[in-house]
């Protein structure tokens, strides 16, 4: 049985001071969880997360990581640094990193390796833009991205890897794949994982949906057998909507 994961990607929102208030309120209002919750804020907020969320059920992590272990790489943040801050997760391969920073599948794979070396679970993002979907090429495009981003990546177990399917055309647009659309792609992703790591491994990897998830559509998405949670953007910034997602997840 795969445990549902609700992971909030804050992107470049909130200051450390604002996050401290948000975390304190979350801590006060958090219901008992059967599912798993995580918040993924900007790097400067991670020490605040470590301080405030340490004794809660809520995990936290980063939105990116360096492909390098350490060295003269100005502006980079290593997996070892994230580990020292207590990060449980880190996103790699988000469409915004691929689009605005030119990140390739090979670079994403290196980042995933660095995280696994430090015991941090990569949330590895894949997904197609609108023009690819309209051509009917969404599945081969996404699976090619998945295979390239997992090249040489050997997680110690299925719980050490999370995949997030983010249809790029549905991020921040208010558009959303139907639950059936999401399920169809998640099935293809799981099949590709089975070919790569074996069926027993693939059956236990969590695959999140990451395209404009909100409290109105989350229950329907979770009703799909291969949707194991959400990588949530805008709906994770407001405490009430994040709590609503956690209540839906159970």
Curated annotation (Swiss-Prot):
Gene Ontology annotations for the cellular component aspect, listed alphabetically: cytosol
Subunit-structure text: Homodimer.
Family note: Belongs to the triosephosphate isomerase family.
Primary gene name: tpiA
Enzyme Commission code: 5.3.1.1
Annotated function: Involved in the gluconeogenesis. Catalyzes stereospecifically the conversion of dihydroxyacetone phosphate (DHAP) to D-glyceraldehyde-3-phosphate (G3P).
Taxonomic source organism: Thermus thermophilus (strain ATCC BAA-163 / DSM 7039 / HB27)
Entry-linked InterPro entries: Aldolase_TIM, TIM_sf, TrioseP_Isoase_bac/euk, Triosephosphate_isomerase, Triosephosphate_isomerase_AS
Catalytic activity: D-glyceraldehyde 3-phosphate = dihydroxyacetone phosphate
Keyword Cytoplasm: yes
One Pfam family recorded for the sequence: TIM
BP-aspect Gene Ontology terms: gluconeogenesis; glyceraldehyde-3-phosphate biosynthetic process; glycerol catabolic process; glycolytic process
Metabolic or biological pathway, per its Swiss-Prot or TrEMBL entry: Carbohydrate biosynthesis; gluconeogenesis; Carbohydrate degradation; glycolysis; D-glyceraldehyde 3-phosphate from glycerone phosphate: step 1/1
Keyword list, A-Z: Cytoplasm, Gluconeogenesis, Glycolysis, Isomerase
Species classification: Bacteria, Thermotogati, Deinococcota, Deinococci, Thermales
Residues at the active site: 94 (electrophile), 166 (proton acceptor)
Keyword field contains Isomerase: yes
Top enzyme category: isomerase
Protein name as catalogued: Triosephosphate isomerase
Predominant localisation class: cytoplasm
